[in-house]
Amino acid sequence: MANLRQTPLTCSGHTRPVVHLDFSSVTKYGYFLISACKDGKPMLRQGDTGDWIGTFEGHKGAVWGVALNKDATKAASGAADFTGKVWDANSGEELHSFQHKHIVKSVNFSKDSALLATGSNEKIVRIFDLNKPEAKPEEFTGHTSGIRHVIFFRNDTHLVSCADDKTLRVWDRSSGKEVQKMDFPSIPNSLEVSRDGTVLTVTHSNHVTFLDSESLNKIREFSVPTTVNSASLHPDKTIFVAGGDDLKVYKFDYTTGNEIESFKGHFGPVHCVKFSPDGELYASGSEDGTLRLWQTTIGKTYGLWKCVDGPQINNDAITSPKEVPAI
């Protein structure tokens, strides 16, 4: 196995940089992957193969953030057209469009899919009730610059957000107040809550920081050889992956921080990386307009990686047409 090289599956179809992505949980139909792109057209794919399922048509500006609910029945997107939209992931139909006063950078579903959180350049975190879409949203104020990411956590009793004001903040939904705050020396580029809810993964400058999700105490922090735009912790917490400005996708040991391997496949900076819910692969999105899927264990028979030995699979095994219809 040692002589096997990593052959990512390349998912084309976007026409501009891919800036964010999200996986659903494992469903009876497998799991799914959604990508945010500056072309304004989020795409839904089968998560283990990258096969294109459909494109959500309706935004009039770059899409900055995307989310899938757990069972992949709903998708959400936040965009430069000042809206956060919720979509039926089966039909592609737009279900809700929530108007904001500035660019919506981040969207996230609650566990029960009844609520949508948004973070925008208005410096406000909002929660919309999808069962009462006309109702006034809950609002959380305190950030002093545009918000990059917002995520439900602690069983949806709280939200965690990070912003251009170089802070990470935790919001208590019952009081509507900020209850914890952490300052960083540089802008936090990415934020992830681990699948079991116990660890926050934050990237800033060339660092990846892991925080205890209750106390916000630093569990560990490692430096990466480049400005790191995104990092993701494996579901079993043995390894993490990171990507940034030097076009490489890195894999590190979570305990020691030692680099295990790195791969160059993209032709532009890597903007986002994320492990699949089963941990068998990780996806990366880049300035080059592509998504790539990488095997966690190189050579394992999984998804479209059917060869363990012998010829490598075609790097463009998965492509979708440049112009694709709505779902």
Predicted regions and their residues:
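WD40/WD-repeat beta-propeller blade N-cap
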Residues: 11-18, 57-63, 98-104, 140-147, ...
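Conserved strand-to-loop turn within each blade of WD40 beta-propeller repeats
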Residues: 36-39, 77-81, 118-122, 162-165, ...
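A short beta-strand motif characteristic of beta-propeller blades
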Residues: 7-11, 51-56, 93-97, 134-140, ...
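WD40-repeat beta-propellers
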Residues: 42-45, 84-87, 125-129, 150, ...
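A short helix->beta-strand "capping" segment at the edge of beta-propeller domains
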Residues: 1-16, 49
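Beta-strand-rich domains and repeat architectures in extracellular enzymes and scaffolds
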Residues: 11-40
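Loop/turn segments within WD40 beta-propeller blades
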Residues: 22-30, 67-72, 108-113, 151-157, ...
